[in-house]
Amino acid sequence: LKKSILTLCGMVENAVADAVDAVMTSDRKKAEAVIDNDIEIDHFELDVEEECLKILALHQPVAGDLRYVIACLKMNNDLERIGDLAVNIAKRALSFYSIPTAEMPVNLRPLCECTKNALGKSLDALIRLDADLAAAGLAYDDVIDEMNRENHAKLLGLMHQHPENVERYLNLLNVSRHLE
């Protein structure tokens, strides 16, 4: 079960990183790959859920083991949802295909890195059953929220200054929100 959750996490982390990279570089192929690969994440999520349900049905875990399997079920669902958010980001990237990267008004890479770090620490906490690691993952939340607020404020200002680019700025706002 641990190996399956780690594999799914790796798939999702790659999808998020590739989706953000597609936005930042207007890389159409990378965006399309993220969208196409989502079916693999969806299938893997179903496999992990089935594995968890088999453990519950066949082994009837109790106490700590039961909590662990339930936590894996929840994490599995959350990872699939994050994969779907990566697809949403990739779809936004397709709208930037014709925009030169030098004109990107916000840098989403730091937000992406913080999000990946928070996700990684949270997963490590689950796998190792480590409350300190869980707290370290939560510590990123305020930083991520602040980065999203900064992007939001900057993009709203740009919308007022350049109303002809409102759709583009709204797409970037959504990307930032999805990362948050």
Language model region names:
Residues 1-180:
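Cytosolic, long alpha-helical scaffolding segments
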